[in-house]
Amino acid sequence: MARVKRGVIARARHKKVLKQAKGYYGARSRVYRVAFQAVIKAGQYAYRDRRQRKRQFRQLWIARINAAARQNGISYSRFINGLKKASVEIDRKILADIAVFDKVAFTALVEKAKVALA
């Protein structure tokens, strides 16, 4: 059986990892062994945070809607319940946008929710 030397493949793999680690601090961008661990960990963080981003944005939207709803004299949960009863199907992302940029329209939605709750 012939001896297999893996110089080309190993170099290619090392180059690939070091390219991914470009911009990392110190040995993390220069030493393959350290860079490999850093790249693996970065991938784990990226995977986790792609899921967390969705949660965090929803939390932000809810906080903004709650603040705007309370300025109009209604709590977030009662406001959402009122919108459901009034069969207004606007998602939280759009509601938060309306709350920040169009106060008049948001006030109209609050009034609609209050009427549906009464």
UniProtKB/Swiss-Prot annotation:
GO terms for biological process: ribosomal large subunit assembly; translation. Keywords: Ribonucleoprotein, Ribosomal protein, RNA-binding, rRNA-binding. GO terms for molecular function: rRNA binding; structural constituent of ribosome. It comes from the Bacteria. InterPro entries: Ribosomal_bL20 (IPR005813), RIBOSOMAL_L20_CS (IPR049946), Ribosomal_protein_bL20_C (IPR035566). Pfam families: Ribosomal_L20. Gene3D superfamilies: 6.10.160.10, Ribosomal protein L20. Binds directly to 23S ribosomal RNA and is necessary for the in vitro assembly process of the 50S ribosomal subunit. It is not involved in the protein synthesizing functions of that subunit. Belongs to the bacterial ribosomal protein bL20 family. This is Large ribosomal subunit protein bL20. It comes from Edwardsiella ictaluri (strain 93-146). The lineage of its organism: Bacteria, Pseudomonadati, Pseudomonadota, Gammaproteobacteria, Enterobacterales. The gene is rplT.
